[in-house]
Amino acid sequence: YRYDWARDPDAGMPLAVVRPTSTEQVQTVLRWASAHLVPVVPRGAGTGLSGGATAVDGGIVLSTEKMREITVDPVTRTAVAQPGLLNVEVKKAVAAHGLWYPPDPSSYEICSIGGNIATNAGGLCCVKYGVTTDYVLGMQVVLADGTAVRLGGPRLKDVAGLSLTKLFVGSEGTLGVVTEVTLRLLPPQPTTATVVATFESVEAATSSVVAITGKIRPSMLEFMDAVAINAV
């Protein structure tokens, strides 16, 4: 629990690792930490490559891995999920109801929804379908002093006041710990076809992308140069 996939050599030795299962338990941890001035590092699945879940000396690593409940509402096309679920687990849970959760970071089989929210993760589908923030309708989050607040809700149209929900998506766990999220879902992805093309130069490839996206919006676009292809 000292490291995420960044393997920071300067990672500290935490005072403790806690693995809560509920919002109330997260509140208890953060209240104690706030009262004793102990730093807290929220942690999802630890698959990040930027060191966001790296432990600090004398701090607490708060892992959400045990928070794994999900409820799907096919009528409103929403899901209420805890942050410890993996992205792929959310996809499977909603697919059982004939629905689809589009964000698909390359680590979708091993990364958590909580981590996706913390980093505003995208994926290849973001070209057409957007990134995590486009699918977060609301959340419950515990602030540094242990206060639990609800932001947003299950409605697409929610324009009363400032959009604090958007503020927390991509905040890397610096503003609070997300303990529950309401996700917007879509009908199943339509049948797709894959096209592979080669180009003599980067300029030719980018010009083709501009021409293609001027007529249609592909669900995915991926560019690989010779170095990347040879590495694969």
Regions found by a protein language model. Give the residues of each.
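N-terminal flexible segment immediately upstream of the FAD-binding catalytic core
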Residues: 1-31, 35, 48-77, 106, ...
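Short beta-strand "acidic-cap" motif of Rossmann-like dinucleotide-binding folds
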Residues: 40-42, 220
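FAD-binding subdomain of flavoenzyme oxidoreductases
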Residues: 69-224
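Glycine-rich beta-strand-to-loop/alpha-helix junction loops that act as flexible
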Residues: 43-47
